[in-house]
Amino acid sequence: MSEAFDSRASKALPIEVLISPFVRFARMEAASGILLIVSTAAALVWANSPWKSSYDAIWDVPMVAGVGNFLLTESRHHWINDGLMSIFFFLVGLEIKREVLIGELTSLRNAAFPLIAAVGGTVVPAVIYLLCVGGGVAQKGWGIPMATDIAFALGVLILLGNRIPPSLRVFVTALAIVDDIIAVLVIALFYTHEIHLVSLLVALGGVGIAFGFNLLGISKPSVYALIGVCIWAAVLKSGVHATVAGVLLAFTIPARNYLDRDFFVKRGRWLLERFEKSEPHSFESHTAIHTLQHQCDMIESPLHRLEHGLQPWVSFLIMPLFAFSNAGVRFIGNIGVAVKHPVSIGVALGLFLGKPLGIWLFAWLAVKSRVANAPPELSWWQIFGASWICGIGFTMSLFIASLAFGYGNLLDMSKIGTLAASLVAGVCGSVVLWRRSALGTSEPPVSPATTSASV
C-alpha cells in the first residue's frame, strides 16, 4: 500500500517537471544573494554600455496610482524606493517583532551582546565617514556606511556551510536585526524633510486602529493590508519617509495564534479520518479539506503567516528589482574621481574598516567589562570575520544614499564606495572565516564562563 502511495505521489505534472530547476534554485538558502549579484551586475553592465541613457530613462517614466480624487504620480524609481521598499521594511518589522517576542532579543541577557556590537557597527562607520568628508553637503551621507545588507551577509555565511558554528549565524542575524532597528530610526529621524503634522497624526491614528484590530482578535491579512495602504499614504504625505510606515504596520500584526494546540491535533485527526472515509470529490471530502485548511490558518499566527508568505516576494522580486534600478552607476570617467573623492572614500572606509572595527571593539569591551556574554563556542577570530562580512552594506547602503543625496555626483560617488567596500568586505570576511576553520579550533573561546551562566 505504501509503495503504491509513493508511486502515485512521485508522478509529476509536465509543468512541475518544467519548472523544477527553478524551484530547486529558489529553495537554495543562498539563492536570493545570487539573484542580487546578478541584478547588480546587469545594472552595472547596462549603465556602462552605449545604452546608458535608456537605463536612466526607463526608471524616470511616471506612473499613476490611486482611487478617485486621491492620485499619486511618481516615477518608476520612486515607486520602487517608496512603495516596494515599504513592503521590504514591513518584513523587517515582522522579523524585529518576532525576535523581540520569541527570538534572540527576547531577554536583555541574550540581546546585550549583539545589541552592543551593532551599536559599535553603526557609530564607528559614521564617525569615520564624517572625518573623511569634513563639512558641507556631503555630511548628509553619514548614515550610508552604518547599514548591513542582511540577505547578503547571511548568504555569505550560508555559502561557508559547516565551516562556521551555527551560533555565529545566530549572532549575525541578531546583530543585523538590531542594525535594521537603528537604520529605521536613522531614516525616520534624520532623513525626514518638512513634517506635515496633520498627515502624521492621520498615520498614527491608522496605526492605533490597527492595534485595536489586533486587540479585537482580527487576524485577516486583507484588513491590515487595507489600513496599511492608508498609513503608507499618510506617512508619504507627512514628510517622513514612506518606508517607516511598513515598520509601524508590522508592529501591529498579531503574533499569537487563535487555536489551542491540543484542540488542533484532535480536530485535525478527526478531519483526516472523515476525509479518508468519504467518497472522492464528495461534498463531505471537500468540507473536511476546507475545514482543515481553516484550522491550519488559525494555529499559525498572522505574523508568521505573513512573514512566510512575503519572504519569497521580497527576496526574489523586490530586492533584485531595487538593486537593478539603483545599482547602475557609470564607472567610465568616475573611477579616477572616486578614488580621491571624500564621499566614496568615507563610505568605503566606513564599511570596510569601520564596520568590523566597531563591531569587534564594542563586542570585546562588552565581554571584558562583563556587561554581556558571548556564545561560548565562538572565538574572537570568528567574530572578527563575521564583523567584516557585516561590512556588506549593499542594498541598505544604496537605499540610504538615495535618501541622503537624491541624484547627482555625490550619489554616484557613494554608490561606487558602497559597491567596492561591500565586495572587499565580503571577500575578506569569508577568507578569515575559511582560514580559521582550516587551521582548526584550538583558539580560546570568547566567553569561557558563559556555559555555566547560560539559562
UniProtKB/Swiss-Prot annotation:
| Alphabetical UniProt keywords | Antiport, Cell inner membrane, Cell membrane, Ion transport, Membrane, Sodium, Sodium transport, Transmembrane, Transmembrane helix, Transport
Its transmembrane ranges are: 31-51, 83-103, 113-133, 141-161, 170-190, 198-218, 231-251, 309-329, 345-365, 383-403, 414-434
Name one cellular component (GO) term: plasma membrane
Mention one GO biological process in which this protein takes part, according to its record.
regulation of pH
Primary place of residence? membrane
Location(s), subcellular: Cell inner membrane
Which function does this protein serve? Na(+)/H(+) antiporter that extrudes sodium in exchange for external protons.
- What name does UniProt use for this protein? Na(+)/H(+) antiporter NhaA
